[in-house]
Amino acid sequence: MLKLKDVSELGKHIVVQGGTMRNDAVVRALEQLTGAQVIRCDMPELMGAFGCAIYAREHCNTLVSLDEIVSQAHYSTHLLHCKGCDNQCQVFRYHFDNGKNYYSGNRCEKVFTNGSKEQPGENIYRFKNELLFGRSKTVPEKPRMVVGIPRSLNMYENFPFWHTLLTACGIEVRLSGESTYSGYEQSARMVMSDNICFPAKLVHGHVQNLIAQKVDRIFLPFVIFERKGKEQNSYNCPVVTGYSEVVKSVQSSGIPIDSPAISFKDEDLLYKQCSNYLKSLGVEESQIKEAFAKATEVQEDYAASLVAHNKQVLENARQQKHMVVLLAGRPYHTDMLIQHKISDVLADMGIDVISDDIVRENGQKIENVHFLAQWSYPNRILEAAQWCAAQGDDVQFVELTSFGCGPDAFLVDEVRDVLIRNGKTFTLLKLDDINNVGSMKLRIRSLIESMKLFHEHRAGRKEQNTAVAVSECKDHYKNKKILVPYFTPFISPLIPAIMRLAGYDVENLALSNAESCEWGLKYANNEVCYPATLIVGDVVKAFKSGRYNPEETVVAMTQTGGQCRASNYVSLIKKALEEAGYPHTPVLSLTFGSSLENKQPGLKVNWIKILPVALRAILYSDCISKFYYAAAAREKEVGQAARLRDDFLQQAEGLIRDKRSKDLLDLLSVAAEQFNAICRDMNCPKVGVVGEIFLKFNPFAQKNVIGWLTEKGIEVVPSVLTDFFMQNFVNRKVRVESCIQKSAMPDFVYKSAYKIINKQIGKFNKAGMKFRYFIPFKDIFEEAADARKVISLNAQFGEGWLLPAEIMSYARQGIFNVVSLQPFGCIANHIVSKGVEKRIKYFFPEMNILSLDFDSGVSDVNITNRLLLFVDHLK
């Protein structure tokens, strides 16, 4: 795949080759996309063969013809059938008198491989596997119990710690077997999300393996933070953190699955978490202290051994003048099934293989990148890329990534840029459950050969600038136009008025459209989540329109700093603006958090002044949305509800601008009466809508699913923005109780704030009840209590536990039909939506959930067909 942002880089004449280019439609599509003349010979599929022939002729050193070689050769032919897979290819083996064999007919190189045998290189991954899992098999004399640990995900990072901790507490540890394809296939039916990464899919097989071993308990910790260096944060991705919740939902074997919340970022908190868990198993405090100290030491020794061995391999390779490949990936890419033994393939070619673990103790700060360093494993990969970029040509970089890996949609482009800016090549191998070693070998051989040519031509090549353009703008925001993405028809119209009170000139971008998709795909990685594609596209589209002066305009974007990919939107927009030709346009971060580092600092807002206004505006807009959707399904004349919605939002904007936000309550009472007047007295089928926050509120992003349902006479019961913010009171309480964080303020401060806000919610509930179809706001702690039955409240990534809480709340109201709107491949919703669907249906068997995934290429027909089937179920 060719990622091209500026077609002029290709020139006016383009020559294409390869079998794909025999397709006239492909060639014509390229002409239309580039606007250039595309030239193709009559045999494009043979151009590579011609190239090989020309290369061979230029390097020939004998005058023996091909016919002479064949006539002088003495060989025997044997017909074989390969048993490497179900294809059972017919393979011919040619055995020559000198003892060598040549195979033909094989469609891959899994079993029968041609090529000379080289002295194999060192493979750090074999050493790492043994160092990780080759622990003492000594079993406590009288074990308290047998705890099984799946050989999966972050156990490839922390197994030495957990094995030592549990064993030292008198608990026998049983590890699941090595990953096998048969184990994966037998448990594939348990995978709740088809597009989740392969490493996650393997977890079910490992859990089944432990169930078969009849362990007493299974240990799958809910690890939120890994150990932190100089990076901004050290989160795990939502899949690594929360997959235990999916396992609990689908694998009910009667064996308890323990998933205590864990943070390796703070050793004091880590001890409390371990202590609380072990005490629940009957372990004494004195034994826990000793075991914890020992486990910490063993984990540190493991990390130090990895670093030392990597450095030793590198030193030996340089002494022997061997090529070295830094094969980077997540810790679980150490699993030979996940990586398809790529490290062995490299080593068999005589290459010495090291891993990203070589930078574990570097303490190197990630610089000159458009990337929020929030995830632990990607941070290490990026540090390794920076380290590799500073090395000589004898060290090259290859990255392993799994299909469906959310963070890598941001990471891969930055790794590529870091290497290319420093004159290094970048090779990316994308892995899933399909084993295609032959294709990967070809890419690796291509890398090696290209490096030989690279060395030959390096002398005349100029190094590229390593600087990343960052525009800082500290004091002039109030004199500039600030653009913000369009979010929802209900709160977005009020945002400029709210920010005007803070002294800022804020303007909403236009609602996304098909052009936004095109610009977004051009300037963002095509695997980022759909909302990111649209937001980047909206921003670039605005500047390309010529309506805004990039020197006098600023872009602002919210930033949560959590485990979700949305925290990287600010970096993504910066990168897009730079590549689109607007490097001096600042991008501001709107955040309450202090853990986010942004060289373009956030707005200085007097939140004490603005928050009461913002709260009233959010509550008012949520109430109007409740009025609108209930009335739209019952309106006496088509369009009445929409006109009232727009009218009352416009009036609210005027009140806010006039600093009369307290009058919103009176205006809401008037709105309730007028919405009552346009409604027919009738019952309608009801559908709840949940999902990713941008999709469920933005009409274009969801392809107007909510509008489609309303047109069918269905009352949509919407999610509300209020709950999204109110969940922070629950989140903070849960994080402190789970020892994920220390309390920064006394509890009474939060309790007082909660009471003040809850009182305001009560006032809006009272005014809203004047509309006869109004459904009042629920208490967020009551919703959390329902959610706790199906998922850990530490699941605070993406929509977090709030999404299943909303579904449970609908069920309590008698609404058993719910549409869940998700970006395709959303890593958070793999856990909090599809992942716990079975658990929700355990409590409410009649619950009917339709999950719809969206991206820029989703079929309108497919969405409509699925909605039609869903609507039929309502009748």
Give a label for each model feature.
Residues 34, 48, 57-58:
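Hydrophobic/aromatic-enriched cytosolic interaction surfaces used to assemble or bind macromolecules
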Residues 39:
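PAZ/PAZ-like end-binding module
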Residues 7-33, 44-45, 154-155, 332, ...:
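Glycine-rich phosphate-binding loops at beta-strand->alpha-helix junctions
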Residues 42-43, 60-875:
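An N-terminal assembly and electron-transfer interface module characteristic of large anaerobic redox
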Residues 1-11, 803:
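Phosphate/ATP-binding catalytic cores across multiple sugar-kinase/actin-like superfamilies
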